[in-house]
């Protein structure tokens, strides 16, 4: 894809603007990975958003945890560049990653894995008053929701696809059975930056729904580690390195070992849920999700 002269000129001007404002405050939640690659880190382990500048426009990874985040992300983008947001790539279809789509699309074209649209529409049908409840959270949230409309992906891919935008290449990869019905990892091979979806989260228990299996999670982590990324942005939690994956692998390995030991002692699943302790992870948030983790580990043990 060749850039048009007008876009090249706009890109040069935009880069000069970036250099002049990078010393300014983009907000405490904006962190810089590399030149032109930023992350909006969600508050209190909320979902993250990636901001990638190219010569032909901006690509976002998810749209923020809620519309107040989306508005803050848009404000940061406008400080960084005058170029439009061309694409928004979903790492998953859940509302805490997608409600803010309306802030960016149009003009942004939303891309997700096959099945994301159906998942999003199902949740809208199941929770018809969701937006009304969200607006009641605070006056700021109500203001951020002004103009809300449901925005589903305009493009769905299957298994793998590549998006070339300006000087950057984005490789989209489906992650089977790790979190939702349609999880996507986004890999920038030249920059060695990976947006790893919610296959692994930081300092909190992940919810393991019936569609999720620990072997699928471990397979996805192994694949992503094999890319040898320099920077990793998880779906939730502080961005970092492959240590995020290693910590997650260690946790699931320990969980399976302990569940297996208790199962061999003759304990039922309900007994294991009541008695199992993981003191190494007492500092992790979302402890209400532990039962779903134990159930997933129990399935692994019983399948051996």
Where are these regions (language model features)?
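Bacterial N-terminal signal peptides
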Residues: 8-18
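Sec/Tat signal peptide C-region and signal peptidase I cleavage site
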Residues: 19-23
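Accessory terminal helices/loops
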Residues: 24, 226-228, 239-304
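Metallo-beta-lactamase
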Residues: 25-27, 32-33, 57-59, 63-67, 118-254, ...
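Active-site metal-binding motif and surrounding structural segment of the metallo-beta-lactamase
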Residues: 30, 55-57, 67-112, 156
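Conserved beta-strand hairpin/beta-sheet module of binuclear metal-dependent hydrolase folds
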Residues: 31-76, 184-198
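Divalent metal-coordination and catalytic microenvironments
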Residues: 36, 52, 62, 77, ...
């Amino acid at each position: 894809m060749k850039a048009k002269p007008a876009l090249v000129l706009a890109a040069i001007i935009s880069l000069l603007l970036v250099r002049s404002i990078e010393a300014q405050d983009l907000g405490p939640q904006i962190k810089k990975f590399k030149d032109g690659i930023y992350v909006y880190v969600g508050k209190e382990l909320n979902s993250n958003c990636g901001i990638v500048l190219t010569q032909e426009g901006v690509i976002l990874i998810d749209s923020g945890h809620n519309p107040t985040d989306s508005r803050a992300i848009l404000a940061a983008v406008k400080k960084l560049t005058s170029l439009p947001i061309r694409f928004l790539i979903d790492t998953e279809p859940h509302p805490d990653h997608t409600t803010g789509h309306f802030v960016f699309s149009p003009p942004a074209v939303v891309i997700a894995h096959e099945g994301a649209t159906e998942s999003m529409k199902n949740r809208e049908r199941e929770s018809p008053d969701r937006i009304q409840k969200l607006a009641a959270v605070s006056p700021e949230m109500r203001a951020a929701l002004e103009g809300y409309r449901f925005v589903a992906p305009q493009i769905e891919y299957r298994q793998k696809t590549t998006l070339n935008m300006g000087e950057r290449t984005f490789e989209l990869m489906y992650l089977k059975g790790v979190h939702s019905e349609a999880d996507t990892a986004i890999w920038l091979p030249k920059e060695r930056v990976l947006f790893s979806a919610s296959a692994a989260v930081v300092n909190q228990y992940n919810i393991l729904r019936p569609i999720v299996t620990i072997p699928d999670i471990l397979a996805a982590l192994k694949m992503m580690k094999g890319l040898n990324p320099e920077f990793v942005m998880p779906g939730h939690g502080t961005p970092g390195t492959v240590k995020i994956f290693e910590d997650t692998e260690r946790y699931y390995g320990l969980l399976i070992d302990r569940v297996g030991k208790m199962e061999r002692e003759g304990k039922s699943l309900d007994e294991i849920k009541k008695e199992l302790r993981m003191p190494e992870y007492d500092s992790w948030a979302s402890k209400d999700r532990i039962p779903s983790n134990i159930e997933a580990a129990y399935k692994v043990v019983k399948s051996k």
